[in-house]
């Protein structure tokens, strides 16, 4: 998405940066993991296909993605590649003003440190304020209990469940109260 092509979002513990072609090799290495493929319902891609996917994320107006950097690590080394820990995405349906949000903390050492929590909150706020989303959905593998619980803590409710596909769809309608609550959460993270 060109809207976020020059945006850098600073959090307390993370930085969200646009997905650029120089991020692709590390991202490609992550996606070779069978665990990540299973948790994200992804198929392995060749490196060339991954570059095409990155280009699509950059150019398509119905997709928004950021690479998640560990802010402390980036502060020490100044290297985005070395600091990468995951990504967060929104698939946008402009007609209904709905965004399907995704989060992946690929770096196992970064898991359990609330960096995914902080990333999702910042991405939700970005979608509300800049893309003007009115509703969010999260489609999550039934095996990814941690992610399901995180979205439930963000007040997402179950919309549907597919045993065939092994996933649950959670939904949250944006309200002024929820927006204020998200802003308070970001303030408390600082």
Describe the role of every protein-language-model region.
Residues 1-25, 29-30, 72-190:
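Acyl-donor (CoA/ACP) binding surface of acyl/acetyltransferases
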Residues 36-44:
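A short gly/proline-enriched turn/hairpin at secondary-structure junctions
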Residues 36-37, 63, 157:
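A general structural signal for well-ordered secondary-structure junctions
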Residues 43-65, 70-77:
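Active-site rim helix/loop that mediates acceptor-substrate recognition in acyltransferases
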């Amino acid at each position: 998405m060109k809207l976020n092509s020059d945006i850098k979002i600073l959090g307390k513990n993370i930085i969200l940066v646009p997905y650029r072609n120089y991020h692709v090799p590390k991202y490609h290495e992550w996606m070779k993991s069978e665990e990540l493929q299973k948790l994200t319902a992804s198929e392995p891609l060749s490196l060339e296909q991954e570059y095409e996917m990155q280009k699509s994320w950059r150019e398509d107006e119905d997709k928004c993605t950021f690479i998640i950097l560990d802010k402390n690590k980036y502060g020490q080394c100044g290297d985005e590649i070395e600091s990468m820990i995951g990504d967060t995405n929104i698939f946008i349906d402009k007609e209904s003003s709905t965004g399907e949000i995704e989060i992946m903390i690929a770096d196992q050492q970064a898991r359990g440190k609330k960096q995914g929590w902080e990333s999702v909150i910042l991405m939700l706020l970005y979608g509300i304020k800049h893309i003007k989303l009115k509703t969010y959905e999260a489609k999550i593998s039934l095996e990814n209990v941690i992610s399901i619980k995180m979205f439930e803590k963000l007040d997402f409710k179950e919309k549907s469940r597919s045993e065939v596909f092994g996933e649950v769809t959670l939904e949250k309608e944006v309200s002024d109260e929820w927006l204020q609550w998200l802003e308070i959460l970001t303030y408390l993270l600082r």
